UniProtKB/Swiss-Prot annotation:
Plays a role in virus cell tropism, and may be required for efficient virus replication in macrophages. InterPro entries: ASFV_MGF360. This is Protein MGF 360-1L. Transmembrane segments: none annotated. GO terms for biological process: taxis. Pfam families: ASFV_360. Belongs to the asfivirus MGF 360 family.
Amino acid sequence: MPSTLQALTKKVLATQPIFKDDYCILERCGLWWHEAPITIHHTCIDKQILVKTASFKHGLTLNVALMKAVQENNHDLIELFTEWGADISFGLVTVNMECTQDLCQKLGARKALSENKILEIFYNVKYVKTSSNIILCHELLSNNPLFLNNAQLKLRIFGELDALSINITLDNISFNEMLTRYWYSMAILYKLTEAIQYFYQRYSHFKDWRLICGVAYNNVFDLHEIYNKEKTNIDIDEMMQLACMYDGNYTTIYYCCMLGADINRAMITSVMNFCEGNLFLCIDLGADAFKESIEIASQANNWILINILLFKNYSPDSSLLSLKTTDPEKINVLLDEEKYKSKNMLMYEESLFHIYGTNT
């Protein structure tokens, strides 16, 4: 809650519809940043406050807005964002002048951030899914000594990127580059078009990374765009293998299949990664590597997969195979997350119902 009546008044004013005739009032009230009015909005799911201006039109969390205000040594906004609920400790991440550091400490910040607090800050800011937030987090944090020297963060980022790094060795790149790749991957995961274009324009040499993330995070629209725009060094079967590592990647599995990837290898990869949904899709698409898949499932003592693979009445789904398209719009409709269910999965579940008298 705002700590003063003035801060509360500004907060209420910032939530109102803005007209150009009101700009002079907002500027006098301190609701002005980068030559434009400040407005606040709330996220739909967790009701977090998002600060918006012309420069950050998709919105920043209060804490990220605070970090930017501290970097700019904008004391009025530092006080305002703190009164609106920002954690003043976040300001220590970007502080660059003694007078601003003194203000942060006056507002309640500690003298220095512990390694655990730095880690907490990173994971606090990473989850807000707006282009403005992702881009600014990259600009403020990717080359920030507090984060570059955090051993715990290095281990966690290494772990998150390791599975995706099919054509690079993480040991051979700097942590700064790892963080850049991480924020790029978040833009693709959350399907943030403007953030994706920001990274694509500034890091054109990461084109393979964009494609990898599009495959792994089931972003068939971005995968299609980059695959048709750039020459890639990644084999189509490598792309399919990556898609099959994450259950539910139906659109990118289908896309790779239509480009000619080996669907039997995809089936085997799905079993190796215990991805039941992907396995059924591969069967729908004509995969028949049952012998090899049963051997893998048996070695893992995975009786759920073994029983699925022992069922004999599977057949390809002609409705999937007849379309033969790489159009992401059509693929997305065909494999809609809420509507699509594998024909062969339904057949298998029906067989269990007849045996046990209950749905699985």
